[in-house]
A protein has these predicted regions:
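Sec/Tat signal peptide C-region and signal peptidase I cleavage site
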Residues: 16-20
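Bacterial N-terminal signal peptides
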Residues: 7-15
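Non-catalytic cap/lid and distal C-terminal segments of serine-dependent acyl enzymes
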Residues: 21-213
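Positively charged n-region of N-terminal signal peptides that target proteins for export
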Residues: 1-5
Length: 213
């Protein structure tokens, strides 16, 4: 699962213009160009009951080429930046194309990718003043929504492997901050955590990791 998350999120982050360090190789040309004659995954929109927010919330789910309900899959929860929603990665990137290409090249183990809306409030659209206190607070509230509402829904609806070793979380900007905070704060739930150009903590460091090793 570690290599899966690193390869995928690095490719997606590169697509968004995240600057790579010299020790990290650049993605090869055409990594996000749609190719003909290869198997494609499926994207669907789901709606889940959020007891945290008190409403139904939307997320996008990518299932890999050859998806079968008789198999079990690891899951990556991929979070967007502060100005986006569950559609953000598709509006400004091509995650489904990148995934399909990586599968065609034999570089990924089949997995499910969940793209949620990380702004856990009733009016969760990225409209108006996205820096308003209530909208920013929604990104911290999403931790409870993710753990108590979204993950249980995904694990009830899709054939996934229900252990920390098969559960990853990663994101860009605000989503990167959420990934670090939620992932490091819940290491019993997530074995793999990735943050890219991550926003500041939603929690104080001593609360986030009270017993650093």
């Amino acid at each position: 699962m570690k290599n899966i998350a690193i390869i995928l999120v690095c490719a997606l982050a590169y697509c968004f213009g995240v600057q790579a360090q010299s020790s990290i190789p650049h993605s090869q040309a055409g990594f996000d160009v749609e190719k003909t004659g290869i198997a494609q995954g499926k994207i669907e929109t789901v709606a889940y009951n959020s007891k945290t927010v008190g409403t139904k919330r939307k997320a996008l789910v990518y299932t890999p080429p050859g998806f079968s309900k008789s198999k079990k899959y690891p899951v990556l929860y991929l979070l967007h930046g502060i100005g986006g929603d569950e559609l953000e990665w598709f509006n400004n990137g091509k995650p489904q194309v990148i995934l399909d290409n990586l599968y065609a090249e034999g570089k990924l183990t089949p997995m499910i990718v969940v793209l949620p809306n990380g702004r856990a409030i009733k009016d969760d659209r990225a409209t108006g003043n996205i820096m308003a206190p209530d909208k920013v607070e929604g990104f911290a509230i999403f931790e409870k929504d993710l753990l108590n509402d979204l993950i249980p829904f995904i694990e009830k609806t899709y054939p996934v492997i229900k252990n920390r070793e098969s559960r990853a979380i990663a994101g860009l900007s605000m989503g990167g901050g959420q990934s670090l905070n939620f992932g490091l704060g819940n290491l019993d739930k997530f074995a793999w955590v990735g943050g890219f150009s991550s926003a500041p903590n939603t929690k104080a460091p001593e609360v986030l990791v009270p017993n650093p090793v």
